[in-house]
Amino acid sequence: SMDGDLKEIDLERRSVDLRPVRTKRLRDGSHTIGYLRITQFSESVPRKIEEALEELNEKEVEGIILDLRNNSGGLVSSGIAVADCFLNKKLIVETKNREGIKDSIISEEDTTFNGPMVTLVNSGTASASEILAGALQDNNRSALIGKQTYGKGLIQSLKSLTDDSGIAITVASYLTPNGNNIQGRGIIPDKILDFNEAKDFGSSEDKWVKNAEIYLSSILDKKELQNNEIKISDKA
């Protein structure tokens, strides 16, 4: 304490979940939906995502909810590799240096999952997560649901100084496929959710996930309706 006396306090031990990728299957009415949460972008994440998507494909899920809430980023290369799982020969992100020169990153031809999807984002969605979210939104691959993202889109280089300190110098910025600068602006979702988030993301009490289920089910219902209309016209 401030007066120098020693005091004993009890600390509650809690397990820390270090799994960067979590997945489960949800049922919404007549639809089977996959839930896929990424907590950070580490080196192992792209491989884990591919494995998770293949497992969900085997379970015949019709659509996927991708949860990027409170994912503050990590390895940008990992986020780009995950975007590659969902996008077929599409622009993922552009980098623009201080001279205005742009460099583009395009996804490969093969995708691991090509069904309908929605993506949950919030103010804690940053950096590599925003690159992924922006790529999905701008390519009309996934609607974004939730709140405006953080807005971290700078590429910085650390320059050492003579006193053993350093200074971060901005060398480039990230742009979404539509040319939107992420830095300081973030990404605005297609559908805003203005109510409180659950303490445990992905739990049965998570109203954001429930809203994503409803949104995705409406897409799947329209898809079924269109297929039925095609079948009727074929018979005619």
Regions found by a protein language model. Give the residues of each.
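Cleft-lining beta-strand/loop regions that shape enzyme active-site pockets
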Residues: S1-T162
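Metal-dependent DNA phosphodiester-chemistry modules and their immediately adjacent helices/loops
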Residues: S127, P177-I182
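Short acidic, Pro/Gly- and aromatic-enriched capping/linker segments at domain boundaries
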Residues: D163, A168-A172
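Conserved functional hotspot residues or short segments at active or partner-binding sites
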Residues: N181-A236
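A short, sequence-level motif marking secondary-structure junctions
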Residues: E12-D17, Y174, P189-D190
